[in-house]
Amino acid sequence: RLKPGPKFWAVFYSALGFFQLGWPALAGSAAATLLGAYMGRMPGAPDQATQAWVASALVLAVVLILSFGGTIERMLEYFAWTMLAVVFLFLVTVNVLFVPFSHWATTFTGFFQFSGIPHPIDWGLIGALAATAGSGGIGNLTVTNWVRDKGFGMGSKVGAIPSAVGGHRIQLSRVGTVFPATPENLVRWREWLRYVHADQVWVWALFCFLGMFLNVNLATAIVPHGTDLQGLAAGAYQAQYLSLIWPGFWFLTLFNGFWILFKTQ
């Protein structure tokens, strides 16, 4: 609808989507985490070739996962539920066992307070924060594909994306479908809105907050205040300090981080 026209915007947003979601940055981070869990240390410059091979294998694994399973959304759903259970079980366990409950209150109130601007200001970090927040535009569009493939609302009328192997042919409409505004359809529409509100408030918002809370609560409790967190090693500080309690936590913590990165990929 906007100039210079649909052909330009199709290419423009496809390029943005590729650099945000298709560029294998998450695969590289997941590979570093997996290698760190295996080697007992975070990979460095001598390990770059190995890390690149592991990252390539992870990208290939994602392609294979999406190639099977009837419809893509069903395979993604199986993996998402499994990974969600693994991540939250680990985070809840270590928080309950090793973080004093008085610290839980401090972390919770910190979500509603502003402690000031750090000095010196790291504008690169602030820019990355702003970019991550803004990236939800295209990212959320990809989530709507799952809603459509699941058949929610009018999604059942426009088809789904079949997997390359094992999926039966499903005709996918290029345009949306609007229901006639009859009294019966409006009743169904209001019912779907209740599902949407429950999903956004209780599933999406609540679990996003819990995920942030548990990670921040653990990090601020076990990592000494003022620790300089830089580079790939920044993701290993929780594993390092938890391993002082029990060496096995090095692997478990990094493997948990790997699940998070791999699921996002």
What are these regions (language model features)?
Residues 85-121, 126-145:
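Hydrophobic alpha-helical segments and their helix-loop junctions in multi-pass secondary transporters
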Residues 121-123, 182-209, 238-259:
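Membrane-water interface at loop-to-transmembrane-helix junctions
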Residues 143, 147-148, 153-208:
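Junctions where cytoplasmic loops transition into the N-terminal start of transmembrane alpha-helices
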Residues 7-44, 55-56, 264-265:
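Hydrophobic transmembrane alpha-helices that form the core helical bundles
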